[in-house]
Amino acid sequence: SREPSWDRAVQVQGQMFLETQAKGGLDVQLVYFRGFDECRASKWVREPRALVDLMTKVMCRAGRTQIERVLNHALRQAKEAPVDALVYVGDCCEEDVDRLGHLAGQMGARGVRAFVFQEGDDPVASRAFRDIAKLTGGAHCRLSSTSPDELRQLLGAVAAYAAGGVAALEDANRRQAHRVRLLTKS
């Protein structure tokens, strides 16, 4: 997403791993796009510090969204080994919503749930993000700019799901804020 959000994500990403330590950890791959036609994926990492190191090297650049490339990448990865979840944070969608929906349907058929967190209230993005979440069996949630802890809690809940399934997500829901409980309602 945009630079202020990226900086916040770098700061809070460690929370994702706290939920997973008791369940054997979580492998994470950073996929990002920026600028003109640049979309990159890191190697898979297990340690929170390794992900922070990868994220701090990324600089934001203006450019169109490349959500289709991210979804295609997730599908390719899921063909090689199970991918439990894709977390996407964004504020707009400048792509063909029907094409994204088709890819999301393929992801859902492979068991890859997308948890899509939306900044702002762009109606095209809302439709695209809601459809992606629904077709994958994941969740769409609008982020509030008033709560600095919200993204941390939501990412922790998604990490719990990825590491321990629906039961772990339900456990996280019992312990956390109402917004986290919304993840199980999609």
Regions found by a protein language model. Give the residues of each.
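Von Willebrand factor
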Residues: S1-K43, E47-V89, C93-D96, G120-R130
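A general structural motif
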Residues: G25, A81-V83, G111
